[in-house]
Amino acid sequence: EEVLAGNIKELVLVNCCDTIRSVYDILKDSGQMDFLYMIDMLHCDIECSRERTAAQLKELAETYGAYKEKSFDKKVFLEAFQPKERIQKPHLAVLGARMGQELFQMTEAAMPLPVVNETCVYNRSVGENLPTEEMDFDTLMEWYAGELLHQIPCMRMMDHAGRKVLYQDPSLKGIIYHTVKFCDFYSFEYADIKGHTDVPLLKIESDFTLQSSGQLSTRLEAFAESLGIQDETKKEKVMGKGYYAGIDSGSTSTDVVILDKNREIISSVIMPTGAGAANGAERALEEALKQAKLNREDLDAVVTTGYGRTAISDGDKSITEITCHARGAHFLDPRVRTVVDIG
C-alpha cells in the first residue's frame, strides 16, 4: 500500500514466503519502483548457505551502488553496528510472529513490568565479534552473511533450537505469545513452550491490525492481573468493619454486592446504569449500603469490574471480568479448569 501510494520508491525484500514473492512480482509489474531487489532467506547455517548469502549481499551492494552511482562505504557500514543491551531486571517478553506497533504499545500499557519485543524481526542482532576496518569488501560480506544466518533462528530455519534462549531467561516473569492468522509457523512453537516453561503464558492472535483491540485489551489486562504483581501506587489503606463491596458496571445495568468477612452476601442491588458509569455505580452502592444498614466507612475495600470499571474513580481496585469470572468459578467449584462462558 505504501509503495502503490507513492511513498516508497526503493525497496529490498526478503524472500521468506510465497506472499513476499507475490508482492515482488506485483511491484515489479507496477513500474512504480525506482529500485527493487529481492534477496533469498536461506533456511540453514552451513557453509554453502553462507557462501550463497555472501554472494547475494555482494550482488545487492553492487546493484544498488550502480543505481545510486556510488561505491560501498565501509565506514558507514561499520558504524551501523551497535551493541544490543539485553534487559537484566524482571520483565515480560512478547514472542512469536511479528506484532504491530500499536498492539505492542497496548501490551506495554497493560503490563506491570517492562515488556521486551522478541517477536520475529525484532530480536535480530549480530554476534559480539564485530567487523574490523582491516577487512576488505569480500571479507566483510562473508562475515556479515555468517552473522545473519547465525542469529537467533526464526521458525522457518531448519534448526530452531537456538530460540530456547528467548524463554530460558531467569529474569523473565511472563510471556505473551503472538501469532498471526494464516501464519502457521509459530503455533507449533507455542505448543512446545507451553510444555517447557513455568512462567505465566498468554497466547493472543491478530491479523496485524487492531480490529479486535477491545477483546485483546481485556485479555492482556486479565493476564497482567494473574501475574500477581502489586501496583506500587496503591491508595492508603483505611480499615473498616470487615465488609467488602463489588461493583459490576455494565452498559445497561450496574450490580453491587456487599460481603462480610465470612464471604457471605449481606446485600445485593441491580440498577440501571443510566447516564455515566460513575453516577450509576454511586447510586447502586448507596442502595446496597442502605439495605445492609452500613455506612461507606464500614467498607474495607471496593472492587470494580465490567464495562465501566475504569470510569469509577472511587474504587480501591479495578479488575477485568475475565479475572472475576475465573476466580468466582474457582470459588464456587475448585475443580473447574475451563470456563466456557459466564454472563
Question: Where are the language model's segments positioned?
Answer:
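Short acidic, glycine/serine/threonine-rich loops at helix termini
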Residues: 106, 257-259, 281, 311-316
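Short beta-strand-loop/turn "lid" adjacent to the catalytic site in phosphate-handling enzymes
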Residues: 270-273, 292-323
